[in-house]
Amino acid sequence: MMKKYIIFLLIFAISGCGTKIYNENLPQQNQKYLGATAKCDDNKINKKLETKINELLKKEKIPATNDLSINCNLLKFDEGNRAVRYLISFGAGAATSSTNIKLYNKNQNIVGEFDINATMGMGGFGGDAEEVLDFTAQEVINRLKAKNFI
């Protein structure tokens, strides 16, 4: 019984995160792009998101080319309150972000666009607010794979 309780607590401690896609204009592709790279707006948080997306592309063995440009613009980033996330949980003190993603082909024609809202409501020791960028980056990759872009 104690083992199940500990497992439950561990799962509870690391959960509480999610993403939501909206304003999606992302048509299903007939043919995958040969490569992709992310380029985000010039500020510290956007550059962190850019790095995370490019790391995931590399992990997926997607070549870093300009065939598909993933342009990201973090519209909102709220770090929330780590202490409240740790002490209260259940979404209190949540870190949130809202990001616009635009996709361009190598001729710089827009081929898709969508927005992502990400939330991190809890985590071990309150979680790091920038983990919300991890969820955003992973959702970008998930959407591109689901629509056969990569």
Tell what function each PLM region has.
Residues 8-9, 25, 90:
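Composition-driven detection of intrinsically disordered, low-complexity segments
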Residues 22-26, 109-114, 120-150:
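C-terminal/domain-edge helix-coil "capping" segments
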Residues 11, 20-22, 100:
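Contiguous N-terminal and early-domain "leader" segments and peripheral loops that mark the onset or edge
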Residues 1-17:
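Sec-dependent bacterial lipoprotein signal peptides
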Residues 16-60, 113-117, 146-150:
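A structural "domain/chain start" motif
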